[in-house]
Amino acid sequence: MQIIEITEPKQTDFQQKLQIAVGIDFGTTNSLIAIATNRKVKIIKSIGDKELIPTTIDFINEDLIIGNNKGLHSIKRLFGKTLKEILNTTTLFSLVKDYLDINSSELKLNFANKKMRIAEIAAEVFIYLKNQAEKQLKNNITKAVITVPAHFNDAARGEIMLAAKIAGFEVLRLIAEPTAAAYAYGLNKNQTGRYLVYDLGGGTFDVSILNIQEGIFQVIATNGDNMLGGDDIDVVITQYLCNKFDLPHSIETLQLAKKAKEILTYKESFNNDIISINKQTLEQLISPLVERTINITQECLEQSGNPNIDGVILVGGTTRIPLIKDELYKAFKIDILSDIDPDKAVVCGAALQAENLITQHTNSLLIDVVPLSLGIELYGGIVEKIITRNTPIPIAVIKEFTTYADNQTGIQFHILQGEREMAADCRSLARFELKGLPPMKAGNIRVEVTFAIDADGILSVSAYEKISNISHNIEIKPNHGINKTEIETMLKNAYKNAKIDYTTRLLQEAVIETEALMSSIERSIIKLTKLLSESEISIINALLDNIKDAVQTRDQILIKNSIKEFKSKIKKYLDTKLNINDLRKCKNSNQIK
């Protein structure tokens, strides 16, 4: 993200007093809500004087109970997921198996005596947070800045925004959790340099590389895994306790595991009447999970060109485990920053940003980055990347495209996400068609396509044909989610297949260019039959047949050689009798079928 300077109209003192905005960290394990006043952050406490509110929802005696660590939990992992994904993912299915409505065509849970969507259930948590804030602040709260994992896709972002809207919030901004944490450190510490944000929460792991210079935050790279967090560490410890002490797999054993984990962050051993476990055993159990986070961090550094890192910012309660600090220092030999409570860093950043957006304390805005490239399918299945990976947002990019065939009155647009060169290897986001175009020769139509991503990471695509003034707009809301593991896999596949993809693209471009050449020549022969003798037509047709045979082989060198032979043998016709302007247009334009 990058802070950019924007001057807004000045507000009166009265208007400023009326406006209150909160920051919300909707976590997998715990949620927090806070408000900033004059850049000082206050965490809103719940009933029982708790700042960390468990993100759980229970239904008891016709009442919804938030934060009792029973009932539905880890709801955040379900944002942006389809029923099919839930059924095919063991970890996700285990979260909702007791509530899942498998007869529904979409993801719904049987909860609180009715069928509810994930956004409706999550809204209850937002309502609870809102009510607690209004009680303490004695004011109506309607505006909020909400944090999300860096790799939340459009579907997940849209669902969390819907949940907040149902709860009565106007979402001023969605910002990435690592971004919010870095923002909190940037304003409080005035750090300058390149920093790694290591965010290991209850259910997700995010890592970001940030360049911080005098209040300017620039994201260099992001990576992560939304199926890895403190919850997974709890499961490993629980499994050990069950096997070692013959305990049942129950909520009580899980709570015991969590308590042991917390105690061992500052003591060498934990003992009670039921179990006994020491710090060394804990570290042996969780070492593979910690190593996974180190590997993901290393990949993120490599993607950003291995810059010199000035420090590591720790975020998430799980980072209190001493092994994590030890392994980070061992791997990267850099200072670990943890001055701000890792459980509160994200919500502090969100609250500070919320204050920024409603007051004149600063003109700064936070900007995130695009996790995967976004593009459009060209004729032949080639992908034209419009917005590349790690581009700061908000962003708008305009590119011009044209038609492939003569008298083409419609263009089909296929929006894609990914790093591969061919559409078949990328993720399909949406399709739409621009109809009613004026019938013209291939290459003469000009269509402006705009890809725009707003500050919340929502993509919209518009197409505008200049001659007829026909336009079409679409907001991209993918019908299924993509988690950070899938993003990591897509990136690995892109790197692994880079050479093959590039060769495939060059071949396909050669085929398209050749087909355009043959089409142009064949049209010219028909128009100019009176200017060409039968023998000349026979020579040209024979050479065209050679090109067609070369195309069938899918051999790029053979195709190029056949075109070279064609041009050399009929050079005199190219310049005098055959019109190949269409070919030049096709070669230099982005064509869409």
Curated annotation (Swiss-Prot):
The keyword ATP-binding applies. InterPro entries: ATPase_NBD, Heat_shock_70_CS, HSP70_C_sf, HSP70_peptide-bd_sf, Hsp_70_fam, ISC_FeS_clus_asmbl_HscA. GO terms for molecular function: ATP binding; ATP hydrolysis activity; ATP-dependent protein folding chaperone; unfolded protein binding. Signal peptide: none annotated. It comes from the Bacteria. Keywords: ATP-binding, Chaperone, Nucleotide-binding. One of its GO terms (biological process) is iron-sulfur cluster assembly. Belongs to the heat shock protein 70 family. Chaperone involved in the maturation of iron-sulfur cluster-containing proteins. Has a low intrinsic ATPase activity which is markedly stimulated by HscB. PANTHER family: HEAT SHOCK PROTEIN 70KDA (PTHR19375). This is Chaperone protein HscA homolog. It comes from Rickettsia prowazekii (strain Madrid E). The gene is hscA.
